[in-house]
């Protein structure tokens, strides 16, 4: 906006032009200005300095020198009104120049009125609402046209309406609002500062002459955290460093992060030299020591060569610390012995077998498998030793080495170059291939060994192999650069003898073969870390077997199990022979479904058939009332009735992909057929749903009666399609065998009257609305029920109250087979949700549990 107003172009022109940065900047500036104004007003209310978002990067903490030049980082609101010892002109200007890059801070109009150098500044900036120079017109423009100024408060360019003389500068404001806000903010700041009295606590601020006029509380100054670069209005900034390099952090977290960052950077800066010096052969220092101190802040100031000389070689130190072995470590080069400060090396336990620090023992030349060093003397205190091809090795070390070899064969693979000389630094081979020139022997020891030494597992004691600390590196031929662990004291795994992996104790050091890839401060643990790999363990989750698709003709679609039945089942015969006028298809389906029981489940289907015979007239599905076949089939069924009774015979339409099956528990009970008043009417309502309803079965009482005793077998006849023949209601009269429960005799209550009461409470699942049966479905249901010989109607089904209970579990105390036709809601106008109640065979409730669960599952699937 400022530039546009200066140029005299209306914003429309600029927008009309191809959109460029100015347009974006304008939008951003407007939003920033709005945010700044709002925030500054809020801050002003609470006595805080105004914040200029534009200067977020530049609101600096304390001044600290950069390139020897005292940088003055002036906070957004640094008050220049206080008379201060003047800084050199160039220093103040330099601070402003530095800040200008970030829409730097400049004092309001004072910048144009008086050069920055002429203003009174303490060595440390004072809070003053500063205007970023980019938005300040050149002094010439300001002088020429005082009409337009940049408001010292809202930072917008506008006509000068108010001005406030603040000591050395005059602040101009574009409106009374800005003027009042600025005055209020200054007043609150000064008041807070006076109350706090902490102005003197900041030594950086030299308040030589404190004028009470507009002295600002310094600790309310907008400070920017040196780490997170956020402006925190906290009085507890943490100072770090001294003098001009003092940094301020808003929290201990930022301070710690800063320290870590510095540590990391310095470590990286020093690390390459350290690694190179130790990894690349510095011949002169090789003999002087094989250990290097861990990189610490103190060591950064020490030349690496000195550090190398000072660092005790961990192996020698370990050897000396170890009882018998170390005493004999005379072969160690004098520098090594001198350097060995046992205190610095955490030798875990002096148990470890100092593999011949003793001069008497010849150094183990790490040769290819052929050259296996003689067994080395074992000090009396050493742990149980395992004799390997290389000689005795402490058992724990041997075990670890074997594990390591198995885990990291590639690293162990490199052919070890044996150093015949006892001084060869095999302890150092741990940093094997790190840029070591293939040509020269290398002194890896300094960095590698100390690094790995302390990491040794407590039971791994730094063994000092003769080849380890004092061996002159010159004797160690450099491994090929590619060899992973060229200097490992044992041959590559491929060359290893078949016997137990003869890994010398050196593996303690050898394990850190990864060290070259890791900066020295990282400690490589020489013992294998077992990382558990998750192995999926199958957890069996029982999933009910539900057949949503139409079962084959030979199977009933109970969803529980397909019950293939011999086609010759009497129920099938009954279904077809039952004189009912069922379409052959219906009868066929009924026969197939009702006859679906294999020997295992035949009891279900057969018991179903007798029960249905008892119910024959009630269930008009495909059975004729007096179907002799049904009656004849009863004896066969009777035998089977007592078979598996948990099965559920589903008389639902098999072709329905959706599962309309309601699973009823097979209950061992005698079918008690009773008539329920109005049952006929109910049944008739939807009886001839598709016109497929067979003529009313006048009487199946005969079949029903024999079925009664046989009905003891558990049968779950589930008819999900609501098929009821009007005649069915009339038809079956309760067999004399079955005592009718106190239900009206008009309707056959297949001993379900009591059940009905229970079912009413339990809410039988009559999915009248959920089960949509096509005409074929209804036909099939009719056929199936006829085959089942449903003699009795299920009062529960007939009870409208029961029809509501779609999800109720069937708590059938004694009732067994329930042919539950599920009405298909208004799929066809003729199809009214008439429920065919089928007699329930009263059965022992002991079988209730699994079928109830299955039934619940089926109900749930149905209602889905």
UniProtKB/Swiss-Prot annotation:
A motif (SUMO interaction motif 2 (SIM)) lies at residues 648-652. GO terms for cellular component: nucleus. Residues 1-14 have a biased composition (Basic and acidic residues). Residues 317-338, 417-432, 565-582, 590-603 have a biased composition (Low complexity). GO terms for molecular function: SUMO polymer binding; zinc ion binding. GO terms for biological process: cochlea development; cognition; inner ear morphogenesis; locomotory behavior; sensory perception of sound. Residues 1-25, 304-355, 413-484, 550-615, 725-751 are annotated as: Disordered. Keywords: Isopeptide bond, Metal-binding, Phosphoprotein, Repeat, Ubl conjugation, Zinc, Zinc-finger. A zinc finger (FCS-type) spans 142-180, 216-256. InterPro entries: RAI2/SOBP (IPR026092), Znf_MYM (IPR010507). There is a cross-link at residue 672 (Glycyl lysine isopeptide (Lys-Gly) (interchain with G-Cter in SUMO2)). A motif (SUMO interaction motif 1 (SIM)) lies at residues 618-622. The modification Phosphoserine is found at residues 627, 694. Interacts (via SIM domains) with SUMO1 and SUMO2. Implicated in development of the cochlea. Belongs to the SOBP family. This is Sine oculis-binding protein homolog. The lineage of its organism: Eukaryota, Metazoa, Chordata, Craniata, Vertebrata. The gene is Sobp.
């Amino acid at each position: 906006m400022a530039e546009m107003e200066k140029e005299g172009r209306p914003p429309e022109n600029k927008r009309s032009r191809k959109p460029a940065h100015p347009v974006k900047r304008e939008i951003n500036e407007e939003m920033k200005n709005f945010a700044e104004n709002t925030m500054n007003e809020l801050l002003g209310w609470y006595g805080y300095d105004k914040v200029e978002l534009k200067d977020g990067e530049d609101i600096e903490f304390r001044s600290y020198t950069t390139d020897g030049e005292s940088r003055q980082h002036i906070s957004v609101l640094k008050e220049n009104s206080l008379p201060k010892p003047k800084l050199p002109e160039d220093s103040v200007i330099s601070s402003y120049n530095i800040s200008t890059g970030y829409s730097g801070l400049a004092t309001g109009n004072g910048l144009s009125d008086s050069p920055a150098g002429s203003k009174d500044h303490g060595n440390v900036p004072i809070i003053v609402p500063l205007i970023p120079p980019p938005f300040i017109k050149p002094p010439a423009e300001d002088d020429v046209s005082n009409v337009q100024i940049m408001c010292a408060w809202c930072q917008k360019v506008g006509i000068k309406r108010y001005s406030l003389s603040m000591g050395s500068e005059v602040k101009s404001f574009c409106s009374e609002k800005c003027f009042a806000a600025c005055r209020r903010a200054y007043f609150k700041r000064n008041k807070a500062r006076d109350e706090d009295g902490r102005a003197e606590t900041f030594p950086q601020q030299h308040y030589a002459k404190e004028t009470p006029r507009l002295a600002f509380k310094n600790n309310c100054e907008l400070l920017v955290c040196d780490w997170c670069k956020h402006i925190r209005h906290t009085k507890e900034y943490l100072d770090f460093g001294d003098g001009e390099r003092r940094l301020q952090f808003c929290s201990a977290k930022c301070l710690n992060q800063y320290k870590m960052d510095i540590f990391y950077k310095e470590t990286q800066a020093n690390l390459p030299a350290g690694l190179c010096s130790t990894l690349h052969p510095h011949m002169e220092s090789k003999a002087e020591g094989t250990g290097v101190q861990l990189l610490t802040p103190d060591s950064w100031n020490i030349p690496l060569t000195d550090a190398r000389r000072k660092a005790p070689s961990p192996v020698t130190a370990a050897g000396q610390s170890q009882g018998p072995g170390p005493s004999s470590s005379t072969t160690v080069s004098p520098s090594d012995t001198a350097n060995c400060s046992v205190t610095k090396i955490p030798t875990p336990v002096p148990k470890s077998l100092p593999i011949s620090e003793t001069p008497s023992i010849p150094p183990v030349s790490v040769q290819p498998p052929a050259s296996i060093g003689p067994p080395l003397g074992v000090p009396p205190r050493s742990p149980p030793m395992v004799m390997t091809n290389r000689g005795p090795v402490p058992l724990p070390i041997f075990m670890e080495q074997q594990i390591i070899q198995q885990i990291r064969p590639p690293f162990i693979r490199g052919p070890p170059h044996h150093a015949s000389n006892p001084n060869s630094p095999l302890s150092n081979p741990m940093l094997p291939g790190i840029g070591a020139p293939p040509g020269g022997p290398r002194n890896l020891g300094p960095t590698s060994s100390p690094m790995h030494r302390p990491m040794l597992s407590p039971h791994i004691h730094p063994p000092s192999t003769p080849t380890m600390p004092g061996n002159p590196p010159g004797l160690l031929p450099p491994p090929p650069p590619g060899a992973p662990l060229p200097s490992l004291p044992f041959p590559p795994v491929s060359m290893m003898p078949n016997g137990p992996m003869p890994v010398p104790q050196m593996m303690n050091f050898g394990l850190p073969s990864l060290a070259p890839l890791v900066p020295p401060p990282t400690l490589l643990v020489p013992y294998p870390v077992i990382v558990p790999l998750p192995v999926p363990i199958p957890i069996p989750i029982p999933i009910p077997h539900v057949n949503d698709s139409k079962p084959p003709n030979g199977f009933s679609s109970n969803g529980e199990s397909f019950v293939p039945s011999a086609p010759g089942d009497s129920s099938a015969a009954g279904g077809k022979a039952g004189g009912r006028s069922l379409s052959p298809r219906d009868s066929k389906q009924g026969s197939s479904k009702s006859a679906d029981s294999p020997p295992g489940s035949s009891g279900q289907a057969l018991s179903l058939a007798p029960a249905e015979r008892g119910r024959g007239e009630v269930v008009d599905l495909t059975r004729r009332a007096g179907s002799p076949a049904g009656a004849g089939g009863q004896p066969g069924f009777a035998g089977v009735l007592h078979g598996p009774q948990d099965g559920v015979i589903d008389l639902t339409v098999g072709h329905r992909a959706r599962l309309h099956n309601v699973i009823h528990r097979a209950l061992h009970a005698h079918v008690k057929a009773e008539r329920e008043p109005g049952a006929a009417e109910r049944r008739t309502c939807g009886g001839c749903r598709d016109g497929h309803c067979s003529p009313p079965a006048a009487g199946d009482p005969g079949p029903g009666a024999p079925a009664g005793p046989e009905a003891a077998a558990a049968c779950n006849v589930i008819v999900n399609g609501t098929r009821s023949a009007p005649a069915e209601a009339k038809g079956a009269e309760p067999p004399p065998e079955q005592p009718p429960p106190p239900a009206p005799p008009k309707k056959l209550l297949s001993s379900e009257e009591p059940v009905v009461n229970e079912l009413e409470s339990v809410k039988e699942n009559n999915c009248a609305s959920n089960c949509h049966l096509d005409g074929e479905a209804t036909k099939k249901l009719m056929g199936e029920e006829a085959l089942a010989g449903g003699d009795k109607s299920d009062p529960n089904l007939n009870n409208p109250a029961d029809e509501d209970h779609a999800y109720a579990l069937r708590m059938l105390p004694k009732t067994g087979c329930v042919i539950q036709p599920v009405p298909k809601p208004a799929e066809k106008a003729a199809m009214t949700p008439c429920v065919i109640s089928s007699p329930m065979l009263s059965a022992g409730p002991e079988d209730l549990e699994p079928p109830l669960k299955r039934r619940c599952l089926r109900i749930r699937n149905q209602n889905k």
